[in-house]
A protein has these predicted regions:
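Hydrophobic h-region of N-terminal signal peptides that target proteins for export
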Residues: 10-18
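Positively charged n-region of N-terminal signal peptides that target proteins for export
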Residues: 1-4
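Flexible, solvent-exposed loop/hinge segments and secondary-structure transition points
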Residues: 18-130
Length: 130
């Protein structure tokens, strides 16, 4: 019986630690949402997690986290796609995640779509948990 209680306690503490890893609030009021555990969208190879920085209802910036995508292709995503979200209102950023074609990312279709899904998941998470 004690063993079951200890296991339950460990599981609960792991879940609460997980929630803190997803969204944090910086001293300046910026929320940082990490999609490592909340979005399973895959690029060409594996997941393409991002950090979405949000302040006062605007996306400040999107930062690509460590992934295993092909470097030359993912570089296009970082160079052309991620800056499109800088300083956008959340509603406009959400609409942009739903676009099927994004200029400038030719050849990086899988990565682009996966990153868009990650950004969408981050915005949704922020809106539900802020």
């Amino acid at each position: 019986m004690q063993r079951a209680a200890v296991v339950l306690l460990l599981c609960l503490s792991a879940l609460s630690a997980h929630a803190g890893d997803v969204m944090t609030k910086k001293a300046d009021g910026t929320y940082v949402v990490r999609t490592t555990t909340i979005c399973k969208a895959r690029g060409y190879r594996k997941g393409t997690p991002v950090e979405v920085h949000i302040k006062k209802g605007n996306v400040v910036k999107v930062v690509a986290l460590k992934n295993q995508e092909t470097v030359p292709y993912f570089s296009r995503v970082k160079q052309f796609l991620l800056p499109l979200y800088n300083n956008l209102k959340l509603s406009k950023a959400k609409k942009l995640t739903e676009k099927t074609k994004v200029d400038g990312c030719t050849g990086a279709t899988f990565s682009t779509k996966a990153v868009q899904k990650n950004i969408h998941a981050a915005i949704e998470y922020y809106e539900k948990n802020k």
